[in-house]
C-alpha cells in the first residue's frame, strides 16, 4: 500500500492535533465534578462512563497521522492502567501539557534530544520525591478514603472495598460480578487466584477487556501435558451435551490439542478456556490438589491410576465463576467449606513438621491462597448502562486501594504534583543548564495541569487556584467538591503514590518520544470508489431486493 511521509514541524503538529482531541475528551472526566462521556456502540445501548482509559481505547480518527498521536497518548493511559490500575486521566493530562510546552520549544529551535534528557532527569527527581512524601496506609479508614476518591467520590464504594480488604486481607482477591438487585453487595466465598493466564488469547469471551469469564463451569485438573486431542474427546463430548463451559488446568497443552480447542471455542461448539497449572514439580501437583479440593473435583493423574481418556463428569470440579486474563486466573467456588477447612489443617501440619524455611514459605503461600477466600462485590444498578459505569468505577477503586497498600498515599486532587513544581524548579536551577534546564521547566509547568483541570471542571479558575495552592503548606490543596482550600490528608482526599508516580513516568516517556519525532510514515487514505457505491438503475438505494 502507498505511504504518506511527513517531516519536521508538520509531522509534530499532526501528532499534536490527535493528542489534543484525545486529551480533551478524556480530561472532561477529571475530578469530583468531572463529566461523563457517552460511547456509541455498534450493538446494544450506548455506554456512559467516567473512566479515562476506556474512553481513550474508543477513539479512532479518520486521519492516519492524527490517529498516530491518539495512539501514542493512549499508550500513556494504558501503561498507567497496567501498572497502577488508576490515574489514567491524570497521565493523559500530564502528557498533553508536556507535549504542548515541548513542541513550542522545539519550534523555537531547541534541540529535542537535549530537552528529552532534561525531562527524564526531572522525572527521576520527582519520582524520588513522591516516594519520600508517601505515607504508609495504617488503617481501613485510609483504605476507604482511597477507594472513595478513585470511585469518583462514592463513599459507599470506598467503605465496601475497605470491608472486603478487612475480610480477605490486603493481598486477598476481590472479584466483581454483576448483581441481580439495585443494591451493591459484598459476599466472601471460597476461591483462589493464581498467576497463570489463558494459553491463547482466542479463549477471551470479552474482547474489549481481553478476559475470559466462565459462569458455572466444569473444571478439568490434570498434571500431564495434553498432546493429543483424542485424549480429551470423550470428556469434551460429555460436556458439550450439558451446554456448560469448561476450564482446563494442565501442565501444558500442545499445538494440535490447543488448535482444536480454539476452533471449537470460536465456532461456538464449546465454551472452553485452558490455562497452565501454576508452580513446578511437586509444588505444581500440590497446588492442583488444592484446586481439586476447592472445586470438589479430582486431580486426574497417572499416579492415582486415572487417565484423561477415561475421565467422567463426576471427576471434574465445578465453581460459581472463573475469570481469566492474560496473567491471572480467579476461581470463585462455593459450598465446599468443610473440605477446604480440612485441607488447610493438613497444610498447617506440614508447616509444623518441616524444617526448611523455603518449604514453610511455599506452604504458607498455599495456605493463604486456599484459606483467604475471595471477596465478591455484586454490582447493583437500575440499568445496564449504569451498571457498566459503576463496574468500571469499582475496578478503579479496587486497583487504587491495592496500589495504596503497596506504596502508600500522598495528598490527592493534583496537590502533590503542584507542590513539587517549586521543588523541581529550585533543583533544576542548581543542577541543570541550557536546554536540559528548559526540559525540566517543561515538566515543572505540566505539574500544575491536573490541578488546573480539576478546578476548571468544577467551574473555577484553574490558573488562580494552582498558584494559590503552590503558596500553601505541603498537604494543603483545593477541594473541588466543596470549593475550599483544606488539608487534603485530614479531609481524606488522597491518591496512591504508585498511581501518581506511574502517571508521571508514563506521561514523560510519551512526551519525550513525541518531541524527538522528525518523520512520520503512514498509510495514504483510501480513495472511495464513487461508481460502485450507487444502486442499480431505477432502484432506490435503501431497500434489500
Curated annotation (Swiss-Prot):
Its main location: cytoplasm. It catalyses: ATP + H2O + a folded polypeptide = ADP + phosphate + an unfolded polypeptide. Its EC number is 5.6.1.7. Keywords: ATP-binding, Chaperone, Cytoplasm, Isomerase, Nucleotide-binding. The keyword ATP-binding applies. One of its GO terms (biological process) is protein refolding. GO terms for molecular function: ATP binding; ATP-dependent protein folding chaperone; isomerase activity; unfolded protein binding. ATP binds at residues 29-32, 86-90, 413, 479-481, 495. CDD domains: GroEL. It is found in: Cytoplasm. Forms a cylinder of 14 subunits composed of two heptameric rings stacked back-to-back. Interacts with the co-chaperonin GroES. Together with its co-chaperonin GroES, plays an essential role in assisting protein folding. The GroEL-GroES system forms a nano-cage that allows encapsulation of the non-native substrate proteins and provides a physical environment optimized to promote and accelerate protein folding. This is Chaperonin GroEL 2. It comes from Prochlorococcus marinus (strain SARG / CCMP1375 / SS120). The gene is groEL2.
